Curated annotation (Swiss-Prot):
The lineage of its organism: Eukaryota, Discoba, Euglenozoa, Kinetoplastea, Metakinetoplastina. One of its GO terms (cellular component) is cytoplasm. One of its GO terms (biological process) is signal transduction. It comes from Trypanosoma brucei brucei. This is Cell division control protein 2 homolog 2. The keyword Cell inner membrane does not apply. Keywords: ATP-binding, Kinase, Nucleotide-binding, Phosphoprotein, Serine/threonine-protein kinase, Transferase. The active site is at 168 (proton acceptor). Its EC number is 2.7.11.22. SUPFAM superfamilies: Protein kinase-like (PK-like). The keyword Nucleotide-binding applies. Pfam families: Pkinase. The modification Phosphotyrosine is found at residue 57.
Amino acid sequence: MQVQVQEGQTACDGSLRPLPSAGPASFVPRSLRPAPLRGTSTPDRYSRIEKVGEGSYGIVYKCHDNFTGRTVAMKRIPLIVNDGGVPSTAVREVSLLRELNHPYVVRLLDVVLHEAKLLLIFEYMEQDLQGMLKQRNTAFVGGKLRRIMFQLLLGLHECHSRRFVHRDIKPSNILIDRKESVVKLADFGLGRAFRVPLQTYTTEVMTLWYRAPEVLLGDKQYLPAVDVWSMGCVFAELARRRSLFAGDTAINQLFSIFQLLGTPTEATWRGVTSLPHHNVNFPRWTAKPLRTAVPALDDDGVDLLRRMLCYNPRERITAYEALQHSYFDEVREEEVEKLMRFNGA
């Protein structure tokens, strides 16, 4: 089943380009059409139940929505206030996120500006992928793994089509709705909204494990390809139940990548020697067969992973292209039908 993109596509070089309108079977839902934003609420609409986490941007609380009665998640983000007040760019960027309405992206329901804090109200999900991986005794395989990755790539493509780059995809930023058997990307767009420098993104060492090599080498372009690399690392982790690359420093992370994929050269990655943190004295490792790292994946799965972990970000497979890969042939039609039902098609 061939599926087309309706209003935007991530090109091979990481740029975005418009495409002609497509037929009814489209990866990009009608939510791409700009929706009017609702007014923000006041803080007393939400009652805190408990603190459930603390991430790159602030504290996360489980809350009760006193208006709707539903359980929601509140991210409380402190803002740097200068003489001009709260930065309008942060509020504007976050407001754009409210237009996202996709079954595989955690929905931003409300934005509340309170004193020097921005309260972001999201749909509440009980568990993240990191927690599920810790609970499981076996890796994800077969149709289950295909469905998870297809859903994540659908969500990723939706956001890239809107020119949002996540920059911090990892298992703890992938939430799970077990009742509906879906996974959802969380925290999309917040890196751009709050201008968080990627090199000092978080004190969590684990974030390094999913970071693209061009970022580790000092590239500041932040193409959508950085998310595809991170998603490839998640893909491998699901298939093997442990991280593919697990360095405890930026240089150790690079060397972990080099030891499996080989030390990149101008022949394998044009322009790599010009990146700020490249060193001509890097150890020279020869690439190993990728299958040795992910023996549970079939040939199609290994091929998809290889394309997601392509060194050159301009040659790395895009989320859109990955969705067309033969690895997903047995689940694509069912998943696209689910997406179309969500869109009311």
